[in-house]
Every structure is written in C-alpha cells, then in structure tokens.
Amino acid sequence: MLKILSPAKVNLHLRVLRKREDNYHDLATLMQKVSLYDELEFQPSNRGIQLRCPGFFLPENEENIVFRAAKKILSFSGCPTGVTITLRKNIPLAAGLGGGSSNAAMTLLALNKLFRLNFSTGELMKIGATLGADVPFFLFHGPAWAYGIGDRLKAALDVPKVWFVLINPGFEVSTRVIYEKLNLGLTKEIIHYSIPRFLSMEDMAAGLHNDLESVTLKMHPSLQEIKDLLCSYGAAGALMSGSGPTVFGIFENEDKAKEAETVLGKPGTWAVFCVRSID
C-alpha cells in the first residue's frame, strides 16, 4: 500500500488576459501550494480500478478525475494491473483550491511509483494536462506562474513563505459559470502583461489580484465581508482563490494567523483553516 498527501493551492494573482476562439481563456496566474491536504491510499489489485470516497457523496467511477487519472496512466503504460484507491477529502469541494486537480496529480505520481512505470516528471505533466489545466502545477516543485489556459508553467523564484487563513463559506461555485459571466470580449491580439514582483510580504500584499472577483463577489457579496474581516484581524491582504468561493488572508507569522483562525472559526458557519506555504 502507498499513502500520499494531496495539497490545496491558492492563486496569489490571477489575470484573465483574453477570451480565445476556442472559448477558453488565456491567464496569467501565480499559484502557491498550501498545507491543507486530502489523503489518498493506493493498493494493488487484480480487480481493475476501484475508487472509494468514504464520507462523501462523490462519484466513484469515470466521473471522478481520480479514476480517470488512474485509468489514463495505466493505459499509457500498458500495465495490466488494477488498483484500489481510497480518497479522504479535507479540501472543500468546488472551492477554488484545486482539490480535484491535486488528487489527479498525486494519483499519477503514486501509480508511477507504486508500479515502477518510470515516467519522467515531464511525461507525468503531459498526461496531467490532458486531465485538467491545473493538474501539471501539482507535479511542479514550488510556486509557479501559469500561462495559457493555466497549463504552461514557469518557476516563481523568491516568493516568500507566509501563513494563510482560508475561509470557505460552505457553498460551491461553478468555475464554468464564473467564466461565462466574465465581461470579456473575444480578443485575438496577444496581450502584453507585466508580471508583478512577489519578493516580500509587502510585494505580496500589493500584488494580490483576481479578475474573477468581479463576478463571484457580485453573486456572493458575503465574500467581500469575509475579506474585510480577515484584514481587520491582522491579514496583510485578502483575496478570493481561483473562481471562489474560498477567501484567504496572508499573515507574516503563525501566531497572528492562529489568532485570526481562532476568532473567525468560532461562529461555526464557515470552514476555517490555518495553513502555510509549501513547495
């Protein structure tokens, strides 16, 4: 058996540069993994691919990206074996934290190791890109700028390690719906975009930006209230991650983050997590 942790991510900066003719959008986004994890277990089996998601009403077939990831890498490798996968969720669903993409990436990584398939990291990233635009990022070491539809990665050097308080308000948001409502016309020309610096806590606070907030916060005004609350309890800045609805605040040390987590977690209506940057 092989056990592996599957981390969440936050978007420290997200600009939607243009809508493409294929209806996808070109992005520039800075992604950072954080220490909130789902747990995955893999057990070799002779009964094909079996997926279990105890405690959650999640599909346990090809509708689940974990199942598809397992099927794809075993098919690519020609390996005739099967595997039983157990997924224990801690990352909120449809929350802008990349839980599904992370689960798929860790499935590729785990099965490559478990069955000694000998795919390189680059090859795993190519397989991952066929499953979802964010999947390659979770196979990439450290924070990264992602371009295109999010699948072209460049290492983000010298991004400071910080603490985060994540607040998930308990409802789900459809990424597809948010992009459909984004007021961005079809743009054919290439957009030239200047990347902000993220070399210090001050840089990070100044660089926090998410174009998708213009849609999600209009649909759910309570998210702005959460951002304001985080700042009032010591966050240097606050932002919605991805298409939402999770909002995070950045803190310079663990003590300040823990204090905010304690206070903001008391009402019990939100899921509140104190986490740190990881590579």
From Swiss-Prot:
Record's keyword terms, sorted: ATP-binding, Isoprene biosynthesis, Kinase, Nucleotide-binding, Transferase
Catalytic activity: 4-CDP-2-C-methyl-D-erythritol + ATP = 4-CDP-2-C-methyl-D-erythritol 2-phosphate + ADP + H(+)
Pathway noted in the entry: Isoprenoid biosynthesis; isopentenyl diphosphate biosynthesis via DXP pathway; isopentenyl diphosphate from 1-deoxy-D-xylulose 5-phosphate: step 3/6
Disulfide bridge map: none
A Gene Ontology BP annotation from the UniProt entry: isopentenyl diphosphate biosynthetic process, methylerythritol 4-phosphate pathway
Entry superkingdom: Bacteria
PANTHER family per the UniProt record, alphabetical: 4-DIPHOSPHOCYTIDYL-2-C-METHYL-D-ERYTHRITOL KINASE, CHLOROPLASTIC
Protein's UniProt name: 4-diphosphocytidyl-2-C-methyl-D-erythritol kinase
Name of the coding gene: ispE
